[in-house]
Regions:
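Bacterial N-terminal signal peptides that target proteins for export
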Residues: 1-9
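N-terminal leader/targeting and pre-domain segments
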Residues: 25-62
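Short active-site neighborhood of thiol/selenol oxidoreductases, capturing the structured segment around
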Residues: 62-75
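The canonical Cys-X-X-Cys-His
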Residues: 75-79, 129
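Typically the conserved alpha-helix immediately C-terminal to a functionally engaged Cys/Sec
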Residues: 79-93
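Thiol-based oxidoreductase modules, predominantly thioredoxin-like and allied folds used
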Residues: 94-112
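Non-catalytic, surface beta->alpha helical segment in thiol-disulfide oxidoreductase systems
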Residues: 124-167
Length: 167
């Protein structure tokens, strides 16, 4: 009988650990699809470090986390990332928790010094996403380039990324 119990316990344990751990992440409904044409979120406006600091301060004062996204409208990955952030479920979550500043890099001829503000090497591609906490610390400094391949990722992967960094 003890061998039977041991085997039963072992089988129960294997079944238990083989189930994926349930995530607390919000799921993007299948019916929410990316609408074409994709957004053009970048305006050719030159910003200063002072503008960037003001955005960060204002966002934190509004009890939200600042998100800065460097990119350009010619970049398909930038536009796809923006389209995912515009999905109803994602947009609601982002508006409740974050404030986003899209910074146009043009053809790498505008606002490049603002990437250096965060110690980001500009030659590593776009979009570059910077997520800060309410203490003005960059939370994702090691993977700001995660979405330079946004077009090969799912909308849920993109949404999960932002959910992981919410304070």
């Amino acid at each position: 009988m003890t061998i039977y119990l041991k085997n039963s316990f072992l089988l129960f344990y294997l079944v238990l650990v083989s189930f994926p751990i349930m995530s607390s992440n919000i799921i993007v409904p299948n019916e929410e699809i990316l609408e074409k044409p994709f957004p053009l979120p970048y305006e050719r406006i030159e910003l200063s470090e002072n503008d960037l600091r003001n955005f960060i301060d204002k966002t934190i004062n509004n009890n939200k986390q600042p998100v800065v996204i460097f990119g350009a409208n010619w970049c398909p990955d930038c536009r796809i990332l923006s389209a995912v952030l515009d999905l109803q479920t994602v947009n609601k979550y982002m508006e409740d928790n974050f404030e986003i500043l899209y910074i146009d890099l043009g053809r790498y001829d505008i606002n490049m010094s603002l990437m250096e503000f965060f110690d980001i090497m500009p030659q590593q591609g776009i979009p570059r996403v910077v997520i800060l906490n309410k203490d003005k610390e960059v939370l994702n400094i090691k993977d700001t380039g995660e979405w330079t391949t946004a077009r090969s990722r799912t909308k849920q992967e993109i949404f999960n990324y932002f959910q992981e960094y919410k304070e």
